[in-house]
Design a protein with these regions (language model features):
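Hydrophobic alpha-helical connector segments
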Residues: 71-106
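Amphipathic alpha-helical interaction segments
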Residues: 87, 91, 105-112, 155-163, ...
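Amphipathic C-terminal alpha-helical segment
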Residues: 98, 115-123, 153, 157-181, ...
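An amphipathic alpha-helix adjacent to DNA-recognition modules
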Residues: 8-13, 25, 48-75
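Helix-turn-helix
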Residues: 18, 25-53, 57
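Amphipathic alpha-helical packing segments from all-alpha helical-bundle domains
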Residues: 83, 105, 118-145, 155
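N-terminal intrinsically disordered/low-complexity leader segments
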Residues: 1-6, 208-209
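Helix-loop "lid/cap" segments that line or gate small-molecule binding pockets
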Residues: 91-101, 109-118, 139-142
């Protein structure tokens, strides 16, 4: 049982990294097993069935920790009286930045799903993945942005979420607009990112012509 659990975790780690690097369709189940050091060609199918099952397993493993961290940040912010737009945006972004800091490929994996058009796989993972997006979004609209039309708000919030994931994935990949390719420290980059995303939500709307 312990060996099976270890093998399963190793396969999830390997798949997360390879999917992030090459995309869902860029790597086979067999390649994942081999990269994880497994000699049984069918080991990945045995544990997860198919790629959709493997993607769900990656989500379940990471999203539990990420969402628990978000809940803790939300609770701490509320207790401290910090419940502004920036504070709420920060509770979404910081747990993702912490995944980057810890060296996990989860954010790059999420970015790959976005850019490769695999929203169906994201939705197949269920409410555990989307609950923080919806919960923080509802609180933002209810407390701060209820003057925005509903569709406009959710469009902006989705842009914020997608931008956060893409920006952190690029950071982890080493991309930088700074001279010499140097990067800001992750903490400073994250703070700047939260500032920019907050500005996206608070931007004035352009009147219809």
């Amino acid at each position: 049982m312990v060996l099976a659990t270890h093998t399963r975790e190793l396969l999830i780690d390997t798949a997360e990294r390879l999917f992030a690097e090459r995309g869902i369709h860029g790597v086979s189940m067999r390649e994942i097993g081999l990269a994880a050091g497994q000699r049984n060609n069918g080991v990945t199918q045995y544990h997860f069935g198919d790629k959709a099952g493997l993607v769900v397993a990656i989500f379940e493993r990471r999203s539990a920790d990420v969402n628990a961290r978000r809940l803790a940040l939300l609770g701490a912010a509320q207790s401290d009286g910090r419940d502004g737009v920036r504070d709420l945006v920060e509770t979404f972004v910081v747990p993702l930045a912490e995944q980057v800091e810890q060296g996990h490929a989860y954010v790059r994996f999420l970015s790959r799903l976005q850019t490769d058009g695999h929203r169906d796989l994201l939705l197949s993972a269920g409410s555990e993945v989307t609950s923080a997006y919806e919960r923080i979004g509802r609180r933002l609209r209810r407390q701060h942005l209820n003057e925005l039309p509903r569709d406009l708000f959710w469009n902006r919030w989705t842009l914020v979420v997608n931008t956060a994931i893409s920006a952190l994935a690029d950071y982890q990949a080493g991309a930088s607009p700074l001279p010499g390719g140097r990067q800001l420290p992750l903490e400073e980059f994250t703070s700047e990112l939260v500032d920019a995303l907050t500005g996206m939500l608070l931007a004035a709307t352009t009147p219809e012509v």
